């Protein structure tokens, strides 16, 4: 759509549908840049001679949030430890850039789904450039890799750089903007914290600029970043509101471009006149030929550069644009630009009226002209300084009558002043004029230079993970003063409605995020639920609600004429079942959306910790209501459910909701052409679910919690979450309703107070894309730059999963990632070969073989963290009893070679050798580079090669076991010697049986979390064997019913006192020694589960089977073990003893 042919009223639509980047491409780019970030960070660790990457910052239009659809740019600034000063950046570049280019060539082979990679011609020395483009070529982003000196260090929210940063910059004798990359983060934050609508205006201005570029191809136009700053200046001086007319804003920016030869703009957000060297430099900069637009992060960079750029071409284009359709209102009248200090005014040819902020801030240069910077660090000031010689006023500014009147009043009582005092007096009077003039645009207690953006919190993605607690406290928690005012207003409203209503009020309840204690700074919601006697049941609410609401509105309209001091109140768009109001602080920095809802008192007053009567919910379900139609009736239960959460969990909720708000605000009116996203309340519940299942501690890592929730959001199509704290599946009506809900499409997030309300409904796609993008950012990195892991949480719970869905549950949540398993297999093969070839090379000891064991080798590993063994069989062990000798020396030798292997080979997975000083155990971990929760922990175990080279399907020589029996003093002492047999016993089983083993192991791990601290559970391997036994005795059907198999294993666990399970696949009673030993083992107290590879290993002995049996009894009646009619699934007919 052409800008000039778009009516003024349709500009928002033009921006939303034509200028915002395509969400699919944005998501793909974020994923690619996150992957590249990790690649660059890891590059530092390989080879100690290479410069270390301290951190990586993103800049450019992409990072500032001002990227246009089609093509845009991003800077990846790589801060290296080899740069100790600005000057160092000119050296040690060719080798560094060469290494990075090789890295890029490798990475660029697979930059990400739907993207192509191509190197570009670098526009400057000391940088690398390439382009990522969509497959169809319609969307692209130019990426610049810029190595830089980390002069600022780890950025801290709201902290200004120290003056010596800029004085050292100036003393480096750099060219203008030569080291601007060092200041990427403050530059990005300056723009990024602005309101969404202002960024839309920036997109509109840049779109106009690109149209000019196509017509003026030979002209050297100023960079588009200059127009971003000019747009911010125009908004700060003329508007300052979050909501405004795009046509009026565009008209103002073009008017400034038309008057560009008078422009002199700078900010003191990051630097100022306090330091003598910086102050003197700024004075010189402000005398440069107009336009002057100083970069707010780097004072050496005059982005406006009147001597270099053809602003005159832009000025001509701007002047010719004013009569276009985009500036015409529906009535045909042209929109007018904003008015304010430093902006064009009717009848004035220049911008000759400087901004002054206060009498104590005047700074005089050697010609007596004044320039001023703001003293308020919390604001983002812009300064128009045309009072220098090159921009002397040509036509006096139009006199302001109010200003003259002020001056006359002051002169009556004035004493004679020096020239300097007179100048200060002039400034002081001008301040009052500026503030009163701007009052039509801004709250009265904010100066004309403050912005809505200055109230916005910093970009979450750039907050270091260790600072998240402080970030929440400083930026997300609501103002206590405003909360107190709101409480007073609510009490007054309730008092008004109680006293004057013609209907009897039974009681009231406060809900919404304000009532739940999860309200964010800036804006939140409150539900005032008023229970009336006349509303006697669910069905009877609708007929009376309309008249009650009319009565409420009449009372409140009278009351709102004198609301609580410091607050304003207004009625907003109404809903059929509620009265909608908005309370706002007088400075408009905080607001509350208030819903007043008349409701039926279904629950009645409840004592703490008690459940509503089951008939409450059965009557709700029988009322034929719509989903969540009567949610207000359960407001107290909803509030109490969240109010009991620990304080840190509520902090995590605030962080998640802040991220949610950033995402929704960013895309509001943009691509959001589909369904609305789920409500923020859904993310509160998701946060509680994540914490309950993955942590449960009072103290925890906010970054780990946030990553867990973002991961669940990405898995939204599998979410199935509900609680039974208020309603129970034991009630037939509720059970039937829940079963019906559970058969619906995901996501399912049931309100814990109202089972009819699935709060998970909505479009999660955008949230999922943004969650993936945030995953590689600073906020989710640990101090050493590695990504923090998520908690171990699945999107659905086993006991809440329908029996018919167990196969799907296993495939989605329990099966490990196949690609990761392949990577692990390759890595383990490399490690095994390396150990076999290199260990004990200069010794008589030989590595006979290396065998893989554990769940990973058996094919029963779970998704997430699993275990495995590497058993190294050595020639120095000639019998069982020798296995413990020289263990420390052997472990030390293997460890040295493992570490060498780690250095010499490149792996697809992250390879970490444990540094534990344990002479018995050597461990290492293989972790996925992309799936943070996927890893395998290996134990390296030296062992005696008792079995030798066994042929497949053959039995060991009986002498192996007689020697074992004579040598063994502790049960299972030499089980590592039989790793191959243990592995083969499971690997030979059908795939579906391995799936059942996974299910049983997952259940066991969940029980372990619940039982933690109460006692030692049986070993997990024992449950694997019990599962095989259940299947063998239950018919050995390779395609069995998963719920029946699971139910059978649970039943055997309940009967643990009768368990006696063993196999004679590898050993038998035919040999007298073995036979006598087996009889002795089988006479031991139950349960007995003998290892089929090692008869000395009784896996049922000395464990708290009673605790496991209790959990098995609970699960036997859960949804995963009942059929569609709610009847318990029957187990297979299996005896507890062979």
Swiss-Prot record:
<dbReference type="GO" id="GO:0071659">
    <property type="term" value="P:negative regulation of IP-10 production"/>
</dbReference>
<comment type="subunit">
    <text>Monomer.</text>
</comment>
<dbReference type="GO" id="GO:0009615">
    <property type="term" value="P:response to virus"/>
</dbReference>
<dbReference type="GO" id="GO:0042742">
    <property type="term" value="P:defense response to bacterium"/>
</dbReference>
<comment type="similarity">
    <text>Belongs to the 2-5A synthase family.</text>
</comment>
<feature type="region of interest" description="OAS domain 1">
    <location>
        <begin position="6"/>
        <end position="341"/>
    </location>
</feature>
<feature type="compositionally biased region" description="Polar residues">
    <location>
        <begin position="447"/>
        <end position="459"/>
    </location>
</feature>
<feature type="binding site">
    <location>
        <position position="939"/>
    </location>
    <ligand>
        <name>Mg(2+)</name>
    </ligand>
</feature>
<dbReference type="GO" id="GO:0005654">
    <property type="term" value="C:nucleoplasm"/>
</dbReference>
<dbReference type="GO" id="GO:0005524">
    <property type="term" value="F:ATP binding"/>
</dbReference>
<keyword id="KW-0007">Acetylation</keyword>
<dbReference type="InterPro" id="IPR006116">
    <property type="entry name" value="NT_2-5OAS_ClassI-CCAase"/>
</dbReference>
<comment type="function">
    <text>Interferon-induced, dsRNA-activated antiviral enzyme which plays a critical role in cellular innate antiviral response. In addition, it may also play a role in other cellular processes such as apoptosis, cell growth, differentiation and gene regulation. Synthesizes preferentially dimers of 2'-5'-oligoadenylates (2-5A) from ATP which then bind to the inactive monomeric form of ribonuclease L (RNase L) leading to its dimerization and subsequent activation.</text>
</comment>
<keyword id="KW-0460">Magnesium</keyword>
<feature type="region of interest" description="Linker">
    <location>
        <begin position="342"/>
        <end position="462"/>
    </location>
</feature>
<dbReference type="InterPro" id="IPR006117">
    <property type="entry name" value="2-5OAS_C_CS"/>
</dbReference>
<keyword id="KW-0391">Immunity</keyword>
<dbReference type="GO" id="GO:0005829">
    <property type="term" value="C:cytosol"/>
</dbReference>
<feature type="region of interest" description="Disordered">
    <location>
        <begin position="370"/>
        <end position="403"/>
    </location>
</feature>
<dbReference type="GO" id="GO:0051607">
    <property type="term" value="P:defense response to virus"/>
</dbReference>
<dbReference type="InterPro" id="IPR043519">
    <property type="entry name" value="NT_sf"/>
</dbReference>
<keyword id="KW-0963">Cytoplasm</keyword>
<keyword id="KW-0548">Nucleotidyltransferase</keyword>
<dbReference type="InterPro" id="IPR043518">
    <property type="entry name" value="2-5OAS_N_CS"/>
</dbReference>
<feature type="binding site">
    <location>
        <position position="867"/>
    </location>
    <ligand>
        <name>Mg(2+)</name>
    </ligand>
</feature>
<dbReference type="GO" id="GO:0039530">
    <property type="term" value="P:MDA-5 signaling pathway"/>
</dbReference>
<feature type="binding site">
    <location>
        <position position="1020"/>
    </location>
    <ligand>
        <name>ATP</name>
    </ligand>
</feature>
<dbReference type="GO" id="GO:0005886">
    <property type="term" value="C:plasma membrane"/>
</dbReference>
<protein>
    <recommendedName>
        <fullName>2'-5'-oligoadenylate synthase 3</fullName>
        <ecNumber>2.7.7.84</ecNumber>
    </recommendedName>
</protein>
<dbReference type="GO" id="GO:0035395">
    <property type="term" value="P:negative regulation of chemokine (C-X-C motif) ligand 9 production"/>
</dbReference>
<feature type="region of interest" description="Interaction with dsRNA">
    <location>
        <begin position="12"/>
        <end position="56"/>
    </location>
</feature>
<feature type="site" description="Interaction with dsRNA">
    <location>
        <position position="154"/>
    </location>
</feature>
<feature type="region of interest" description="Interaction with dsRNA">
    <location>
        <begin position="185"/>
        <end position="199"/>
    </location>
</feature>
<dbReference type="InterPro" id="IPR002934">
    <property type="entry name" value="Polymerase_NTP_transf_dom"/>
</dbReference>
<keyword id="KW-0808">Transferase</keyword>
<dbReference type="GO" id="GO:0071639">
    <property type="term" value="P:positive regulation of monocyte chemotactic protein-1 production"/>
</dbReference>
<dbReference type="GO" id="GO:0032728">
    <property type="term" value="P:positive regulation of interferon-beta production"/>
</dbReference>
<feature type="binding site">
    <location>
        <position position="1001"/>
    </location>
    <ligand>
        <name>ATP</name>
    </ligand>
</feature>
<keyword id="KW-0694">RNA-binding</keyword>
<feature type="binding site">
    <location>
        <position position="855"/>
    </location>
    <ligand>
        <name>ATP</name>
    </ligand>
</feature>
<dbReference type="GO" id="GO:0045071">
    <property type="term" value="P:negative regulation of viral genome replication"/>
</dbReference>
<feature type="region of interest" description="OAS domain 2">
    <location>
        <begin position="463"/>
        <end position="793"/>
    </location>
</feature>
């Amino acid at each position: 759509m052409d800008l000039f042919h778009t009516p003024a009223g349709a500009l928002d639509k033009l921006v939303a549908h034509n200028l915002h980047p395509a969400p699919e491409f944005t998501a793909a780019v974020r994923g690619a840049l996150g992957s590249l970030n990790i690649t660059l960070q890891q590059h530092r660790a390989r080879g100690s001679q290479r410069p270390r990457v301290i951190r990586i910052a993103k800049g450019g239009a992409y990072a500032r949030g001002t990227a246009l659809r089609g093509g845009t740019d991003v800077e990846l600034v790589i801060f290296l430890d080899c740069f100790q000063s600005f000057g160092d950046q000119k050296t040690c570049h060719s080798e560094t850039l060469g290494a990075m280019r090789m890295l890029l060539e490798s990475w660029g082979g697979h930059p990400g789904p739907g993207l192509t990679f191509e190197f570009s011609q670098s526009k400057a020395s000391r940088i690398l450039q390439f382009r990522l483009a969509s497959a169809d070529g319609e969307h692209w982003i130019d990426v610049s890799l810029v190595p830089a000196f980390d002069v600022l260090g780890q950025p801290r929210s709201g902290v200004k750089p120290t003056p010596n940063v800029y004085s050292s910059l100036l003393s480096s004798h750099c060219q203008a903007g030569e080291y601007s990359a060092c200041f990427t983060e403050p530059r990005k934050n300056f723009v990024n914290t602005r309101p969404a609508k202002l960024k839309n205006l920036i997109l509109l201005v840049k779109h106009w600029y690109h149209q000019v570029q196509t017509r003026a191809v030979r002209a050297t136009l100023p960079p588009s970043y200059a127009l971003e700053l000019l747009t911010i200046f125009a908004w700060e001086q003329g508007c300052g509101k979050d909501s405004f007319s795009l046509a009026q804003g565009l008209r103002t920016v073009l008017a400034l471009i038309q008057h560009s030869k008078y422009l002199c703009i700078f900010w003191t957000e990051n630097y100022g006149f306090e330091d003598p060297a910086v102050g003197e430099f700024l004075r010189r900069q402000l005398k440069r030929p107009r336009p002057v637009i100083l970069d707010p992060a780097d004072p050496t960079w005059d982005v406006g550069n009147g001597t270099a750029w053809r602003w005159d071409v832009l000025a001509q284009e701007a002047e010719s644009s004013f009569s276009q359709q985009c500036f015409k209102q529906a009535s045909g009248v042209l929109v007018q630009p904003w008015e304010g200090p430093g902006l064009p005014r009717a009848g004035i040819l220049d911008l000759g009226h400087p901004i002054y902020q206060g009498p104590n801030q005047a700074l005089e240069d050697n010609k007596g002209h004044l320039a001023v910077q703001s003293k308020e660090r919390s604001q983002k000031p812009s300064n128009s300084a045309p009072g220098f010689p090159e921009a002397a006023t040509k036509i006096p500014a139009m006199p302001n009558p109010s200003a003259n009147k002020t001056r006359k009043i002051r002169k009556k009582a004035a004493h004679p002043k020096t020239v300097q005092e007179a100048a200060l007096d002039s400034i002081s009077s001008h301040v009052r004029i500026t503030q009163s003039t701007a009052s039509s645009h801004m709250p009265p207690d904010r100066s004309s230079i403050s912005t809505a953006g200055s109230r916005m919190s910093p970009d979450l993605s750039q907050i270091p993970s260790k600072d998240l607690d402080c970030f929440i406290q400083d930026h997300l928690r609501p103002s206590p003063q405003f909360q107190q005012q709101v409480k007073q207003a609510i009490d007054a409203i309730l008092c008004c409605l109680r006293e004057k209503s013609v209907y009897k009020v039974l009681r009231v309840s406060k809900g919404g995020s304000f009532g739940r204690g999860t309200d964010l700074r800036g804006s939140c919601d409150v539900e005032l639920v008023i229970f009336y006697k006349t509303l006697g049941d669910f069905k009877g609410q609708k007929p009376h609600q309309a008249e009650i609401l009319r009565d409420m509105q009449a009372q409140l309209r009278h009351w709102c004429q004198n609301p609580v001091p410091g607050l304003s109140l207004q009625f907003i768009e109404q809903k059929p079942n509620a009265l909608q109001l908005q309370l706002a602080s007088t400075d408009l920095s905080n607001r509350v959306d208030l819903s007043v809802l008349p409701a039926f008192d279904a629950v009645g007053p409840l004592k703490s910790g008690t459940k509503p009567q089951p008939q409450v919910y059965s009557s709700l379900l029988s009322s034929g209501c719509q989903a969540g139609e009567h949610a207000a009736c359960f407001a107290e239960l909803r509030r109490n459910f969240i109010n009991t959460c620990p304080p840190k969990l509520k902090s995590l909720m605030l962080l998640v909701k802040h991220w949610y708000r950033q995402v929704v605000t960013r895309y509001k009116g943009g691509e959001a052409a589909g369904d609305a996203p789920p409500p923020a309340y859904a993310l509160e519940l998701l946060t509680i679910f994540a914490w309950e299942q993955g942590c449960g501690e009072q103290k925890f890592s906010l970054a780990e919690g946030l990553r867990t929730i973002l991961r669940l959001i990405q898995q939204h199509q599998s979410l199935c979450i509900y609680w039974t704290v208020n309603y129970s599946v034991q009630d037939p009506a509720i059970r039937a309703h829940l079963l019906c809900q559970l058969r619906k499409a995901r996501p399912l997030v049931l309100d814990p107070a109202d089972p009819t309300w699935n709060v998970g409904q909505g479009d999660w796609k955008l949230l999922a894309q943004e969650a993936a993008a945030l995953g590689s950012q600073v906020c989710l990195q640990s101090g050493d730059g590695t990504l923090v892991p998520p908690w171990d949480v699945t999107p659905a719970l086993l006991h809440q999963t329908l029996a018919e869905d167990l196969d799907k549950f296993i495939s989605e949540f329990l099966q490990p990632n196949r690609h990761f398993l392949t990577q692990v297999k390759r890595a383990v093969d490399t490690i095994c070969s390396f150990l076999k070839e290199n260990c004990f090379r200069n010794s008589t000891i030989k590595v006979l073989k290396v065998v893989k064991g554990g769940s990973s080798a058996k094919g029963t590993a779970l998704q997430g963290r699993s275990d495995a063994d590497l058993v190294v069989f050595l020639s120095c062990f000639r019998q069982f009893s020798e296995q413990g000798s020289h263990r420390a020396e052997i472990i030390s030798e293997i460890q040295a070679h493992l570490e060498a292997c780690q250095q010499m080979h490149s792996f697809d997975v992250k390879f970490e050798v444990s540094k534990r000083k344990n002479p018995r155990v050597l461990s290492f971990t293989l972790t996925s580079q992309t799936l943070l929760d996927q890893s395998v922990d290996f134990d390296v175990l030296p062992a005696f090669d008792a079995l030798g080279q066994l042929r497949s399907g053959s039995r060991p020589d009986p002498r192996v076991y007689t020697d074992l029996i004579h040598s063994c003093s502790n049960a299972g002492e030499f089980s590592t010697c039989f790793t191959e047999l243990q592995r083969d016993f499971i690997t030979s089983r059908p795939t579906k049986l391995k799936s059942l083993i996974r299910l049983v192991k997952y259940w066991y791990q969940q029980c372990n979390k619940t039982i933690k601290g109460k006692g030692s559970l049986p070993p997990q391997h024992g449950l694997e064997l019990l599962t095989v036994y259940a299947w063998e005795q239950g018919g050995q059907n390779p395609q069995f019913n998963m719920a029946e198999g699971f139910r059978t294993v649970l039943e055997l666990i309940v009967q643990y006192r009768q368990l006696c399970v063993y196999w004679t696949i590898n050993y038998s009673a035919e040999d007298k020694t073995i036979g006598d030993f087996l009889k002795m083992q089988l006479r031991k107290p139950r349960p007995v589960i003998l290892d089929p590879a090692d008869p000395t290993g009784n896996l049922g002995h000395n464990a708290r089977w009673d605790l496991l049996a209790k959990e098995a009894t609970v699960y036997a009646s859960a949804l995963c073990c009942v059929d569609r009619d709610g009847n318990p699934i029957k187990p297979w007919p299996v005896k507890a003893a062979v």
